[in-house]
């Protein structure tokens, strides 16, 4: 592992050094070696994809740490750093989840974020799927997003609920392929339900973003 660490961690260590933060960098390096240890020693030699994913992980973390003002750099709490690294090693290949872990790790180095960090965040991230992560990012960027229900109302009276929750994370030009995940109503509904269960979003069917109306299909 020792011969692989310099390649993977040099950029991060260099960034921290320019901020006069050798101690936090050393803490991270030692934590990485302790957590990933023999697992990566084997996988990095046998799997080029694993090496690539690790490098992208550190690259993302480095970019985020570079944005932290020098005066805000702090020694990360091991109670955040350790569990986050431990959990993330099983999600390295999932880019969307990996990005969230990188953001959490970067925040642990930022004193201005200390009051916002909570130890439960690691467990919450572990319960996210890649689709959950993409949908959460989509919603966070827009603050409010529309959801809908599909109901059939019969002329004779009565209703039939076709879809209890419809969420389409669409922005820009609609893609022609109906295989795109944005049109997978059931998966997106399950994703939104999970995000609400975790307390990350709130689904509200009582507030309308536009005028309430019914669409009649003949």
Task: Give the residues covered by each predicted segment.
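Short amphipathic alpha-helical interface segments
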Residues: 116-180
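Charged, alpha-helical interface segments at or near domain boundaries
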Residues: 5, 9-131, 138
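Hydrophobic/aromatic-lined pockets within catalytic cores
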Residues: 36, 40, 140, 144, ...
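Short amphipathic alpha-helical interaction segments
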Residues: 178-210
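Arginine residue identity/basic-tract feature
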Residues: 45, 50, 98, 134, ...
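Generic preference for hydrophobic/aromatic residues in regular secondary structure cores
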Residues: 8-9, 13-16, 145-154, 201
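Short, amphipathic alpha-helical interaction segments positioned at domain boundaries
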Residues: 211-218
